[in-house]
Design a protein with these regions (language model features):
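N-terminal basic, low-complexity leaders that serve as flexible interaction/assembly modules and, when applicable
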Residues: 1-99, 142, 150-154, 245
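Active-site loop segments of alpha/beta catalytic cores
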Residues: 1-14, 21-25, 101-105, 109-259
């Protein structure tokens, strides 16, 4: 996803003298805020995320949440953090604690990688991979169609396709980086499975919203503040082939631009 942290967004509104509206945190892991139409118009923004609840047809359901600086905000209604050992914790679709927010942190960290102790290819295949449901696809189509027919914005949807960042969450940072460097622990099979899942979801997504959107946001965290996370040679060998296939599929099967 791409955006601005909710605390920073609240400070921006204060700086601009805007006291009304709401702070809606659509990405609670990174604590990213949706941008209100008043702000979009102020900065003459001409593109909008398909899921922006301030502009689109589906406002969604929200619940109150206090940010770490005391700012009142709204979280998705499905946001159910637990307090475990002094930390806020969130479970994923498999029931494991996947995210934790320490007391002194401003966002959630990924924890408890489910494939940390991978023993065989069967561990990869038996993991509960997350595919779009028919209900999710229908809702996305409804949102994209509304924005396409009723606004002047270019419509963007986020997808990701993270071939470096995604496996890091399932294997753990240290494990996966070692796997890439050494070629161990079924790293090629894991990358292949991620690509398979991404491509399946990508095909369904484009079939549902491809005629209504103009941009699709792909992504991967490939660098630090100072350097690439992995060497260019390792990227070309392990990651780039999958990026290339995903981006090429979009280009060859839709009129959507890759961002």
């Amino acid at each position: 996803s791409t955006g601005i942290m909710a605390i920073a967004y609240a400070q921006l509104k204060k700086h601009l003298g805007i006291s009304g509206g709401e702070i809606r945190v659509y990405d609670y892991g990174q604590q990213l805020a949706e941008i209100e139409k008043e702000i979009l118009d102020l900065f003459e923004v001409d593109v909008v995320d398909m899921n922006n609840s301030f502009v689109g047809i589906e406002p969604g359901k929200w619940k109150e949440w206090i940010l770490k600086d005391g700012t009142k905000s709204l979280m998705p209604a499905a946001f159910y953090p637990e307090k475990i050992n002094g930390k806020f914790a969130i479970r994923d679709h498999t029931g494991r604690v996947a995210l934790e927010m320490p007391e002194n942190s401003l966002y959630f960290d990924s924890v408890n990688p489910p494939l940390e102790n991978i023993k065989s290819i069967n561990d990869i295949n038996s993991y509960q991979w997350n595919y779009f449901s028919d209900e999710e696809l229908r809702l996305m189509e409804k949102k994209a169609k509304y924005l396409y027919e009723n606004t002047e914005y270019a419509v963007m949807t986020g997808f990701g396709g993270n071939m470096l960042e995604g496996p890091q969450e399932l294997r753990g940072w240290m494990n996966y980086m070692s796997d890439l460097a050494l070629g161990d622990n079924y790293v090629d099979e894991l990358l292949g499975k991620f690509f398979e899942v991404y491509l399946t979801n990508l095909k369904m997504l484009l079939q549902s919203v491809g005629k209504y959107i103009q941009l699709i946001q792909m992504g991967d965290d490939m660098g630090t503040q100072a350097n690439p996370i992995i060497s260019p040679d390792l990227y070309r060998d392990k990651i780039k082939p999958y990026h290339k296939k995903l981006y090429r599929y979009i280009q060859e099967n839709s009129d959507v631009f890759v961002f």
